[in-house]
Curated annotation (Swiss-Prot):
One of its GO terms (molecular function) is melanocyte-stimulating hormone receptor activity. The keyword Membrane applies. It comes from Nomascus concolor (Black crested gibbon). It is found in: Cell membrane. The gene is MC1R. InterPro entries: GPCR_Rhodpsn, GPCR_Rhodpsn_7TM, Melcrt_ACTH_rcpt, MSH_rcpt. This is Melanocyte-stimulating hormone receptor. A lipid is attached at residue 315 (S-palmitoyl cysteine).
Amino acid sequence: MAVQGFQRRLLGSLNSTPTAIPQLRLAANQTGARCLEVSIPDGLFLSLGLVSLVENVLVVAAIAKNRNLHSPTYCFICCLALSDLLVSGGNVLETVVILLLEASALAARAAVVQQLDNVIDVITCSSMVSSLCFLGAIAVDRHVSIFYALRYHSIVTLPRARQAIAAIWVASVLFSALFIAYCDHAAVLLCLVVFFLAMLVLMAVLYVHMLARACQHAQGIAQLHKRQRPLHQGFGLKGAVTLSILLGIFFLCWGPFFLHLTLIVLCPQHPTCSCIFKNFNLFLTLIICNAIIDPLIYAFRRQELRRTLKEVLTCSW
């Protein structure tokens, strides 16, 4: 958050666009050319952030309440929800402070606002990195449960899961602090982009491998029932659609933000890149949308968690 102009920022000086207003318009870049700028209303941004907060708080509360959910798999899901909660919470807090400063309802010295901005940036950046890590951890956990089913409980133990979780959080905080301190260095930005691509490749390879194994299993069952082609093809199509949705949402929600970082390194002054930079708030909103979708994909589809969630909502503690 810059004191002058009260700009919504996520990672230090990465964004130089003004606070969003509720419209879709053509904006002029530095050369006078026209480019498309999608502006996000503050009310919409806050609403999405609050929805994400509520969803992920419910996931964390449900897993904490039910001891049957204290397994490595649910620990990773809980940490993913906590990461998404912090992503949404940090951005909601930053936006609220900006609006209060703009309305002169909050008086603060420039140094205090800058320190608050730095804290929010570290929290938001570390939670974004940890969110990506836990998405990868969930994929690895599922892969082990399928390909090493008989040895799963000896491979993925609760102590090992806790060690992995602690390592992810520590690494995320350290990396975010480094990233905030040296965000003007191209190497740091590229490291973050490479990290995103690595997570994308990891998830794609693991889930495609799992889909192939599931199709083989379905084919074997179909052969026993002499229904090889209809059952196998139907299962394969359903699995491919599910996989496409999972990876598509991940890429759609996270990809534009990392494209933004890549273009900062490759073409910071190019007119076309300048047009893309103007949509920073849209890219940030897509990440908030991902924080809303994650519980629907990884948490609410599980019957035991849904049952516990009903108990939480009815306050039957």
